[in-house]
From Swiss-Prot:
SUPFAM superfamilies: E7 C-terminal domain-like. Belongs to the papillomaviridae E7 protein family. One of its GO terms (cellular component) is host cell cytoplasm. One of its GO terms (molecular function) is protein domain specific binding. Residues 1-44 are annotated as: E7 terminal domain. Pfam families: E7. GO terms for biological process: DNA-templated transcription; symbiont-mediated perturbation of host cell cycle G1/S transition checkpoint; symbiont-mediated suppression of host innate immune response; symbiont-mediated suppression of host type I interferon-mediated signaling pathway. This is Protein E7. It comes from Human papillomavirus 36. The keyword Signal does not apply. Homodimer. Homooligomer. Interacts with host RB1; this interaction induces dissociation of RB1-E2F1 complex thereby disrupting RB1 activity. Interacts with host EP300; this interaction represses EP300 transcriptional activity. Interacts with protein E2; this interaction inhibits E7 oncogenic activity. Interacts with host TMEM173/STING; this interaction impairs the ability of TMEM173/STING to sense cytosolic DNA and promote the production of type I interferon (IFN-alpha and IFN-beta). The gene is E7. The keyword Signal does not apply. A motif (Nuclear export signal) lies at residues 75-83.
Length: 102
């Protein structure tokens, strides 16, 4: 280095002295990105799920089985509904409820 300020020309990197096992990597590898049509097909693929949920009444211990066909996004949204504001009712508890709040 000549002078008080470092310039790019003064910096010399020799990786072979620091770590001999470090080799340059070809960043243009043979990897291919999937085309957009394939991604859309995967997103719209519907799978059959069996959902087991408890009855929404506090005094009932019935387990309800529901079979649905949904995408991965759809089943996750359904799961969020069931663990949030939406509750399924068994036929007996449904008969004891008033419909529509009336």
């Amino acid at each position: 280095m000549i002078g008080k300020e470092v310039t790019v020309q003064d910096i010399v990197l020799e990786l072979s002295e620091v770590q001999p096992e470090v080799l340059p990597v070809d960043l243009f590898c043979e990897e291919e990105l999937p085309n957009e049509d394939t991604e859309e097909e995967l997103d719209t693929e519907r799978i059959v799920f069996k959902v087991i949920a408890p009855c929404g009444c506090s005094h009932c211990e019935v387990k309800l089985r529901v079979f649905v066909q949904a995408t991965e996004f759809g089943i996750r949204a359904f799961q969020q509904l069931l663990t949030g504001d939406l509750q399924l009712l068994c036929p007996e508890c449904r008969g004891n409820c008033e419909h529509g709040g009336s």
